[in-house]
């Protein structure tokens, strides 16, 4: 140290202190910036994970309902086969047996693809699955129960594809 020039020493100490304070300020600024970058990285990771989950959910929904249009277009075929079987009565005619077999096979294939038949005769009316077309007084039937089904309804993977058209017992 230079004892002969105390002013120079104090100036040098002041300069060192100022430099140290500047370095400390820079370190604090860099730490704050690092904390911000870490927070940004965590947020981006969370966003990426959420996006991945959303895409997986969308793909699952697309796969689950990919055959909705085809099965929806088959509903009139089911209706025609069902009506033909009802019109044929209980005769054990080979044509009737063939129609029954075809109908059961079609229902099985559709069922294997998520289609569920709604035939609510005798069940309580459910506005989420049934469409009431009329109410009739029906002795012996519980009020609000389905007494006649004009057109069966269908669910596709637990989602309503077509409501059942029904007549409900009046109160």
UniProtKB/Swiss-Prot annotation:
<comment type="similarity">
    <text>Belongs to the GrpE family.</text>
</comment>
<comment type="subunit">
    <text>Homodimer.</text>
</comment>
<keyword id="KW-0963">Cytoplasm</keyword>
<comment type="function">
    <text>Participates actively in the response to hyperosmotic and heat shock by preventing the aggregation of stress-denatured proteins, in association with DnaK and GrpE. It is the nucleotide exchange factor for DnaK and may function as a thermosensor. Unfolded proteins bind initially to DnaJ; upon interaction with the DnaJ-bound protein, DnaK hydrolyzes its bound ATP, resulting in the formation of a stable complex. GrpE releases ADP from DnaK; ATP binding to DnaK triggers the release of the substrate protein, thus completing the reaction cycle.</text>
</comment>
<dbReference type="InterPro" id="IPR013805">
    <property type="entry name" value="GrpE_coiled_coil"/>
</dbReference>
<dbReference type="Pfam" id="PF01025">
    <property type="entry name" value="GrpE"/>
</dbReference>
<dbReference type="InterPro" id="IPR009012">
    <property type="entry name" value="GrpE_head"/>
</dbReference>
<keyword id="KW-0143">Chaperone</keyword>
<dbReference type="GO" id="GO:0006457">
    <property type="term" value="P:protein folding"/>
</dbReference>
<feature type="region of interest" description="Disordered">
    <location>
        <begin position="1"/>
        <end position="22"/>
    </location>
</feature>
<dbReference type="GO" id="GO:0051082">
    <property type="term" value="F:unfolded protein binding"/>
</dbReference>
<dbReference type="GO" id="GO:0000774">
    <property type="term" value="F:adenyl-nucleotide exchange factor activity"/>
</dbReference>
<dbReference type="GO" id="GO:0051087">
    <property type="term" value="F:protein-folding chaperone binding"/>
</dbReference>
<dbReference type="InterPro" id="IPR000740">
    <property type="entry name" value="GrpE"/>
</dbReference>
<dbReference type="GO" id="GO:0005829">
    <property type="term" value="C:cytosol"/>
</dbReference>
<protein>
    <recommendedName>
        <fullName>Protein GrpE</fullName>
    </recommendedName>
</protein>
<dbReference type="GO" id="GO:0042803">
    <property type="term" value="F:protein homodimerization activity"/>
</dbReference>
<keyword id="KW-0346">Stress response</keyword>
């Amino acid at each position: 140290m230079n004892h002969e020039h105390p002013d120079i020493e104090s100036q040098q100490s002041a300069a060192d202190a100022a430099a140290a304070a500047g370095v400390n300020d820079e370190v604090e600024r860099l730490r704050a910036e690092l904390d911000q970058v870490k927070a940004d990285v965590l947020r981006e990771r969370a966003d990426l994970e959420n996006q991945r989950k959303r895409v997986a959910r969308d793909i699952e929904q697309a796969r689950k309902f990919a055959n909705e249009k085809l099965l929806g277009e088959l509903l009139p075929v089911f209706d025609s086969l069902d009506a033909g079987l009802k019109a044929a009565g209980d005769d054990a005619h080979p044509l009737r047996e063939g129609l029954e077999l075809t109908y059961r096979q079609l229902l099985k294939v559709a069922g294997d693809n998520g289609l569920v038949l709604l035939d609510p005769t005798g069940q309580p009316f459910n506005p989420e699955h049934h469409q009431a077309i009329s109410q009739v007084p029906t002795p012996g039937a519980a009020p609000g129960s389905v007494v006649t089904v004009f057109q069966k309804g269908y669910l596709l993977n637990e989602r309503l594809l077509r409501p059942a058209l029904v007549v409900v017992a009046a109160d």
